[in-house]
Amino acid sequence: MSTENSPTDYATLTQVLQQQGVALTAAEMHGLLSGLLCGGNRDDSWLTLVHDLTNEGMAFSQHLSQPLQVLYGQTRSALEGGEFAFQLLLPGEDDASVFARADALAGWVNHFLLGLGMMQTKLGQVKGDVGESIDDLRNIAQLGYDEDEDQETLAHSLEEVAEYVRMAAMLCHGEFSCSGGPASDTPRLH
């Protein structure tokens, strides 16, 4: 598996997830972790939430837990680094067809929204740019394509949508991670 400083490999993580009986792809798991982080998670509760959502509340084996902790740390560092280093974990164009990549992006977005909703339970009340981005993500999660469509055109469109998703995730992180965001029920002293 990857080390703390090298990026997580999509195919390797997907294989480990399958071996451990977790019915998520690497894209879906990264989307879930990203959603939790962008929703404001700042403690070890993320692992319990992931166990509950993906493994019937049972802890993962060390063989899976360690790579997920590395991925969580890498994702958190990229989001908090302030250098726009955050990237979606999706299969590369050399590793998957444009259709498989579109499916992976839709899966990433679905699980991102799940993680975000776990941390921010009032997403429907969020207004402004962040609210619009969340609405757009809901539409992107329903991403469809026509298999007769020109694959080069679809690949170009997919790149643009993936970049929009990346920016929307960073926007959500900026909104919810520092202050708890408008959907937080955390009391504040004034």
Swiss-Prot record:
It comes from Edwardsiella ictaluri (strain 93-146). It holds the Pfam family UPF0149. It comes from the Bacteria. Belongs to the UPF0149 family. This is UPF0149 protein NT01EI_3357. One of its GO terms (cellular component) is cytosol.
